[in-house]
Each structure stands twice: as C-alpha cells, then as structure tokens.
Regions:
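His/Cys-centered metal/cofactor-coordination and adjacent catalytic loops
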Residues: 24-29, 43-69, 125-143, 189-190
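Inter-heme linker and motif-flanking segments adjacent to c-type heme-binding CXXCH motifs
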Residues: 50-51, 97-101, 117-133, 145, ...
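Sequence context surrounding c-type heme c attachment/ligation sites in exported
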Residues: 31-39, 148-160, 198-203, 210, ...
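Electrostatic cytochrome c docking/interface patches
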Residues: 22-36, 125-155, 194, 243-253, ...
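Bacterial N-terminal signal peptides
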Residues: 10-20
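Sequence/structural segment immediately N-terminal to covalent heme-attachment motifs in c-type
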Residues: 27-46, 142-168, 175-180
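Bacterial N-terminal signal peptides that target proteins for export
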Residues: 2-12
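Extracytoplasmic electron-transfer domains, predominantly the class I c-type cytochrome c fold
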Residues: 57-104, 111-114, 118, 176-221, ...
Length: 260
C-alpha cells in the first residue's frame, strides 16, 4: 500500500510515516511500555497484570489487578474507564498511604508507553471509551461556616460508618470492608493531612463524585449537590488542623482553594 502511494504521490509515503510516528508517540508505544512495565511495575502488579507480583504477598494493601480496567483515580464517572491523563496522574503522583509510589523518575514518553501497555491487560480498553469528564465547579472557598455545613453532610451520608466520627478510619464497619477482589481494606484516615488521590481540593471533590472503583468508597454524584460536596471537602480538610490552616491561608489569593 505504501509503495503504491509512493508511486502515485511522491513524498506522500514519507508523510504517512511521519503521521504514523506522531500518532504512536501520542498514544504510547506498547512494545517499549512492556519493557518499562517489566522493569518498574511487574514486581508488584505481576507479569499478567493481575496484581500478584512477587512483592504483593508482603503488602497489606494489595496492588491493583489491571484485568478488569478498574481504577481508583479517575476524572470520569463511576464504572467508566479512566482517561490516559488519569493514569498518568497516578503514575506521576502515586497514591498516598499505599505502596504505589510516585514515578516522576520516568520521563513523559516512558509514562505514556507504560500506560499503553497496562491498558492491554483489560479488553475493556479495546471495546469501550471513557465517559465524559466530571465537571468540577469553582471552589467557593474554605470557611468556618462551610466546615460546619460539611460536618452535617458527613453525618447525613453516614461517612462515619467507615471513616469514624473523627475521620480516623475507625468506624463501626472499618474491619468488615473488602475490595472487589476480596482483600481486606482499612478506611482511610482523613486526619493525616494528605489524601490518597491528591491533596488539591478538586481531587477530594472528584473522589466524592466519582468514588474509588474497586473499593467500598461509592460515588455520590447522583445524590450530592455541588454545594454540599464543597462543604464536605472543607470539612475533610478541617480534620487535619495544620492542613486546614494552610488551605485557609491560600483562599484570599487563590479562590479555588487549591494549593499551588
């Protein structure tokens, strides 16, 4: 085909090669991604992407099984596949409180390539497309009034059942929780001052609306208003006094409430 195009349109074949290379670079190179995966990821996630690498048995929080295409951090609705940018977010930032570290040591190309390879473990990526990104409205700003309202939201949605009245992960159901693969889970301690999927206020908001797929943490997008969600974000931030103080100090110059 390429030879025929070259005869009919001199120079076009070279252009197609350039375009093809650009597309490969944009979507990631699976072959190179496999090499990156084997070097950095396989010891935990396994050679089949099943979360059963050699190191997995020593981990209290088990590595993710990639075969179902189920990921904790997503900008898409519950049940949807993540975007490539979501997977890159996890690679770049890690998941605080788990064994998933940051992989800032990897350059952008390597991250893109390993994402392309990881996606081959689940047939969902070949047959489905991610749903539209969850829209996050502007943060109205951290305030004592918002924290008070957020405490009421925390009670209304029974967050204390898992996370405990003080947010320390010691609720009545804390010892009964398991992930989709039957592994024991401990609810996150919200008083640590760091949040598993990112410290930005938008990250916390997103978790409320998207949930954490594969875990008992549900999505509240169908029942939680954006105003209540922001109040709940501010309440969660208030559980760690040092962190809340830092957030409050940024509001005047950064209305979104996000730390820069």
């Amino acid at each position: 085909m390429t030879n025929r195009i070259a005869r009919l349109f001199p120079g076009a074949a070279g252009l197609l090669l350039v375009i093809g290379s650009a597309m490969a670079a944009d979507t990631g190179d699976v072959k190179n991604g496999k090499l990156v995966y084997e070097r950095y990821c396989m010891s935990c996630h396994g050679d089949q992407g099943n979360g059963q690498g050699e190191a997995a048995e020593y981990m209290s929080i088990k590595p993710r099984d990639y075969r179902q295409g189920t990921y904790k951090w997503r900008s898409t609705p519950s049940g949807s596949l993540p975007l490539d940018s979501d997977l890159e977010h996890t690679l770049f930032n890690g998941l605080y409180g788990t064994y998933m570290p940051t992989w800032k040591v990897l350059d952008e190309r390597s991250r893109r390539d390993v994402i392309a390879y990881v996606k081959t473990f689940s047939p969902r990526f070949a047959t489905e497309k991610p749903q539209e990104v969850i829209v996050i409205p502007p943060d109205p700003g951290y305030s004592d009034a918002s924290v008070t309202r957020g405490a009421a939201v925390y009670l209304k949605y029974n967050c204390a059942q898992c996370h405990g009245a003080g947010g320390q992960g010691d609720g009545p159901s804390a010892h009964e929780l398991k992930d989709d693969w039957g592994n024991q889970l401990v609810p996150y301690d919200l008083t640590k001052g760091h949040v598993k999927c990112g410290d930005q206020s938008t990250d916390i908001y997103r978790v409320f609306m998207a949930g954490l797929s594969g875990t008992p943490m549900p999505a509240f997008s169908d029942s939680l208003s954006s105003a209540d969600a922001w109040d709940l974000v501010h309440f969660i931030q208030s559980l760690s006094p040092g962190y809340a103080k830092n957030v409050a100090g940024t509001v005047a110059n950064n209305p979104s409430g996000d730390k820069k």
